[in-house]
């Protein structure tokens, strides 16, 4: 969970179901002290990385150094995914395609980020690593992110 300003408080509990997974709340130095107290009161582990916003690069370094984590899996929304790929912090992109079409102007995208603007914001290239056909005609696509 990435929340640099301490806004998300409803219905959140620490992940205790699976000892193989570890959920960490990520926040920034400007998060209100009462928010950090809220996280502690619910035994929700957190890391502070960044001043006004969560510094994703610093966060990944801290997770590796403090928790010895080598692999992070995120099923985040488009904003976090977009920020990670635009910051060159993703190694792989895994996409699960389901055989349904959901349309609409408000439908979320896989990657929400600033519009392309040459030369500062360029498209991210992907190289196909693997495909698998799953049950119910679903397809799993696994890509390596190629940074030039």
Tell me the role of every PLM-derived stretch.
Residues 1-148:
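Enzymes that bind and transform nitrogen-containing heteroaromatic metabolites
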């Amino acid at each position: 969970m990435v929340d640099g300003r301490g806004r998300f408080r409803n219905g959140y509990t620490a992940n205790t179901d699976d000892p193989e997974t570890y959920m960490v709340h990520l926040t920034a130095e400007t998060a209100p002290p009462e928010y950090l107290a809220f996280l502690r009161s619910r035994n929700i582990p957190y890391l502070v990385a960044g001043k006004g916003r969560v510094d994703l690069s610093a966060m990944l370094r801290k997770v590796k150094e403090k928790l010895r984590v080598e692999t992070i899996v995120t099923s985040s929304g488009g904003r976090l995914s977009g920020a990670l790929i635009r910051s060159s912090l993703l190694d792989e992109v895994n996409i699960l395609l389901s055989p349904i079409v959901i349309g609409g102007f408000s439908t979320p995208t896989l990657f929400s980020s600033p519009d392309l603007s040459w030369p500062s914001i360029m498209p991210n290239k992907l190289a196909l690593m693997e495909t698998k056909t799953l049950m119910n005609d679903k397809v799993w696509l696994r890509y390596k992110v190629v940074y030039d």
